[in-house]
Amino acid sequence: MPCRREEEEEAGEEAEGEEEEDDSFLLLQQSVTLGSSGEVDRLVAQIGETLQLDAAQDSPASPCAPPGVPLRAPGPLAAAVPADKARPPAVPLLLPPASAETVGPAPSGALRCALGDRGRVRGRAAPYCVAEVAAGPSALPGPCRRGWLRDAVTSRRLQQRRWTQAGARAGDDDPHRLLQQLVLSGNLIKEAVRRLQRAVAAVAATGPASAPGPGGGRSGPDRIALQPSGSLL
């Protein structure tokens, strides 16, 4: 029957196509594994040319390429070059034209690092590098010199010394701080005795002398006004 013959012919054609594909695969594998380096390079160049042509047909215009310049496929010279030495084509970059203000050189003395001057001590108000920029659109901030770190460390040490001296002066007037220092040093009893002796001497020097009695003795013991413990310490 004709239908059965057509089916047999189609099945035979499919079998022949599969055999051809298998043969081509085997030939390709043999050429890659057993062929010389020239054949491999030629095959790689042909594959790359085919891929580039397909990519050029899919994307007619490249966004990076300037208008009016068509993409050219690699010629026979490019195919003859080995694949390991071939380089991708350079793509031109479109850059905006620079303005005259940005291209022009900055005026001399426009930038000066405030912390770059060695030997100059900075205060607490400006511990970081501050670049003094002159008026003008072309003046740009620049890097500071290497001495700014050394100046910052010196200023910090001076500030710590000032704070330590100020704290010591304030500690003499603070009774709680003085009491803490005496307790830690172990001189609390000595300081209390010294202050009591000073108070007794002050009272004896300023107080009126008591009148002597008929027996030539004193009418009573001397009255000594002692200060409270809070005022002593």
Curated annotation (Swiss-Prot):
User: Where is it found, in Gene Ontology cellular component terms?
Assistant: cytoplasm; cytosol; nucleus
Location of the region described as Disordered in the Swiss-Prot/TrEMBL record: 1-24, 204-233
Please list the GO biological process terms of this entry: canonical Wnt signaling pathway; regulation of protein export from nucleus
Using the UniProt annotation, give all residue ranges assigned to the region (Involved in GSK-3 binding): 174-196
Q: Which UniProt keywords apply?
A: Wnt signaling pathway
Acidic residues bias: where? 7-24
Quaternary structure annotation from Swiss-Prot or TrEMBL: Binds GSK-3 and prevents GSK-3-dependent phosphorylation.
- Family statement: Belongs to the GSK-3-binding protein family.
- List the PANTHER family hit by this protein, alphabetically: GBP PROTEIN, GSK-3-BINDING PROTEIN FRAT2
> What protein name applies here?
GSK-3-binding protein FRAT2
Q: Which organism is it from?
A: Homo sapiens (Human)
Query: What gene name is given for the protein in this entry?
Result: FRAT2
